[in-house]
Amino acid sequence: MKKILFVLAAILLLAITVQAKKVKVTIDGRVSPSQTKLYLIINEDTANAQLLPIKDAKFSVTIEVDSKAFVRLHDWKEWPERSAFVLIPDSRHITINWNTGEIEGSELSKKLKKALDEIKQHSPEGFHIDVFSDDPAAWRSAQESGNSMREMMLQEQRMIAKQTILDNRKSFICAWIVYCFPELMKGELEAMLDHMKPKWMNHPILKKKQQKN
């Protein structure tokens, strides 16, 4: 009987240990004067996105969330890759400025924003070579050069994503990077993550994405 009670106590302790810690955080700030909509989405649960009231280009909301949640603020709830702000509740009060992109009160949110900005800066998306000629050969040459340049940029972007993950391997901010840039995770990066088996790969947003796929 004592052995059974001991096992049950151990299971209960484990459940308490792994249970996500809840935190209460106030998020406020300024938005663009013309902005009429602002959604708050927790861990990409867009079905339960919260439409925040805006008054005089300001907003304020207090929420209780998991300490490792990703809180996305945007006027378009279905577009995580282009989010204006992705916040991590590592403090009780976070303030954002929509016009300048500044975040106050959350060092983890700043760290994530910096990592995302660096990866996006090297994106080949939209890159092209202008051709001021009607010569088909010139067009073919430009297309080949453009494809080669885009591939080089993609490889560089992939290397930056890899280094970012290695530098932050124990931080769950990597979960958002993997979520937003799945195309960069193929091949070498995918093999690296399979080998590392980081705990953040069990984050709810990645589990949800795996279920969809």
Set out the residue ranges of the language-model regions.
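Intrinsic low-complexity, intrinsically disordered segments enriched in polar/basic residues
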Residues: 2-5, 16, 114, 201, ...
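Amphipathic alpha-helical repeat scaffolds of TPR domains
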Residues: 132-136, 140, 169-180
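Intrinsically disordered, low-complexity regions
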Residues: 1-2, 20, 162, 170, ...
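Bacterial Sec-dependent N-terminal signal peptides
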Residues: 1-28
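A non-transmembrane, solvent-exposed segment enriched in polar/low-complexity residues
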Residues: 20-163
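Charged, long alpha-helical assembly modules
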Residues: 166, 173, 177-213
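Generic detector of low-complexity/intrinsically disordered segments
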Residues: 7-10, 14-16, 40, 53-54, ...
